[in-house]
Amino acid sequence: MYEIDDLVYTDAGVYWNAKGVKRFEEYIQMLKDGEFLITFQSSYLEKDYSKGDILKFTGHYNDDNVLMSLQLLSGIVIIKKNAEGMRFVEDWYELCHHHFNLISDKVSAVPCIRGFVENRHDQSALSLLAKQRRHIEISYKETLPLSLDWSQMEAFPIQARQYKKKKMQWKEKHIFELKKPYMALIAWYLKRYKHFYFSPTTKVYW
């Protein structure tokens, strides 16, 4: 990438809506107007999806304004390649690669905030680092309607709905079922000996 290029990142499977090109151009104009980081909200509170360790490390543990704000998505982000944008990416990389315990499912040494559900890994890192600096937040209403009525979303370019996966063939399904005891054993090992946790809704796959 060249200096001052714009990086638009979305997870594989995120739906791009061609009818939303006008709004997408508005996102890019925000960067031209001097912003360097455009983030997109999830519909969940930060305190519920970031464990105590990472909240303390990033200086947000006692900051109610951050704790009660909506967590930002790591699967949709727009960054300008300038000094500020590069610093943000470097900080994100540093935290994820050199402080892995902060983004892992290991039980937090620092007590989690009441209502905690689970840590969101690199997303918790991106969200909390973004909130340390100037950034734009696009409302979750532009990426995910709570009613799941996607017909409301024609004006918006980036939508957090996944393309449907191909239905598994009989052989693939059979192999997957046979692997379940192995996956359960690994999950038990991680919980028992590595002090990881998994919420009741977490699916553990390898």
What annotation goes with each model-predicted range?
Residues 1-206:
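Glycosyltransferase catalytic domains, chiefly GT-A lineage
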